[in-house]
């Protein structure tokens, strides 16, 4: 009858179809969220696995216009040797003075590579550095480095604790330089969501994203391993079996003896279980048994 047909049409249009549509949309959203998180994790892993440039002296260059370009001279181990600032761009245009300062730093500290951040004024800074190297026949090269997340790290409690006497921009120049020397050690200090290699993170389920990214970072760190003599607490916290208490014990012991020469020395400060869980991911580069 027409009443039954009308009832069927109404129920399909008003109840059944919207319900099916919501269910399909929900399934697709869940799938899209999973794919996006997997993509985010994969990108983070690939970035962290960028090969380090060991044994090079770096000049970290954080470009800017009005506030000036911040410079950080780093030795082969990433230790800060000098901090400076130049104003080669608008509105100052102190090109000659800036060029003299770059030449002075490169020659004084035997700089191998100048790491230029890819943010504001990056193109102008690249042109300035290229001309400076060419005009003065400097024996160094320059590289453009992603500075995504550098500002986040520079303003963090970790950065303030590490460099309490420097301002945010100066810490950023240090971070840019260290990213070239050892990307893994530097990038683990930054929340993976701030590195800028995935979709807009606030569109994704935060708990699932945090867990996936934490797992990705931990997997990379344990896959590569860490040099116990140079690793920061930010890096050590991802090593299987270690926690804040054991990390503090390792750092205290390292400060006491200056450097570890054998992994067996860790047995003095780690329990048998923790030693068993963590030792496979710890390296001592100049030891007989790495």
Can you say where each PLM-predicted feature lies in the sequence?
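Helical mechanochemical/support elements of P-loop NTPase systems and associated helical scaffolds
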Residues: 20, 33-36, 40, 44, ...
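Short coil/turn segments at secondary-structure boundaries
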Residues: 19-28, 56, 60, 117, ...
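Extended, highly charged clamp/arch subdomains and adjacent linkers
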Residues: 1-57, 76, 99-104, 108
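Non-catalytic alpha-helical coupling and interface elements of nucleotide-dependent molecular machines
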Residues: 17, 49, 111, 134, ...
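Accessory alpha-helical DNA-binding modules that contact the DNA backbone or grooves
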Residues: 223-290
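Conserved phosphate-handling catalytic cores of large alpha/beta enzymes
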Residues: 94-113, 120-225
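Short glycine-rich, Thr/Ser-proximal phosphate-binding strand/loop in the N-terminal lobe
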Residues: 74-93
């Amino acid at each position: 009858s027409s009443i039954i047909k009308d009832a069927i049409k109404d129920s399909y249009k008003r109840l059944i179809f919207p319900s099916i549509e919501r269910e399909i949309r929900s399934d697709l959203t869940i799938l899209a969220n999973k794919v996006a998180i997997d993509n985010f994790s994969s990108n983070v892993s690939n970035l962290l696995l960028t090969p380090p440039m060991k044994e090079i002296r770096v000049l970290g260059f954080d470009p800017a216009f009005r506030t000036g370009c911040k410079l950080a001279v780093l030795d082969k181990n990433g230790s800060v040797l000098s901090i400076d600032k130049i104003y080669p761009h608008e509105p100052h245009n102190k090109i000659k003075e800036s060029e003299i300062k770059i030449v002075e730093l490169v020659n004084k500290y035997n700089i191998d590579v100048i790491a230029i951040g890819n943010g504001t004024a990056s193109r102008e800074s690249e042109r300035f550095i290229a001309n400076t190297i060419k005009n003065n026949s400097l024996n160094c090269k320059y590289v453009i480095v992603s500075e995504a997340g550098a500002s986040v790290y520079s303003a963090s409690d970790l950065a303030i604790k590490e460099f309490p006497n420097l301002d945010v921009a100066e810490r950023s120049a240090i971070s840019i330089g260290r990213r070239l020397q050892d990307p893994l050690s530097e990038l683990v200090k930054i929340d993976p969501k701030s590195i800028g290699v995935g979709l807009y993170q606030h569109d994704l389920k935060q708990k699932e994203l945090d867990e996936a990214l934490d797992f990705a970072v931990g997997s990379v760190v344990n896959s590569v391993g860490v040099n116990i003599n140079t690793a920061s607490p930010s890096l050590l916290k991802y090593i299987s079996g270690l926690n804040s208490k054991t990390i503090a014990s390792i750092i205290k012991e390292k400060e006491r003896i200056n450097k570890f020469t054998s992994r067996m020395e860790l047995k003095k400060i780690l329990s048998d279980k923790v030693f068993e869980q963590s030792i496979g991911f710890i390296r001592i580069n100049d030891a007989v048994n790495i």
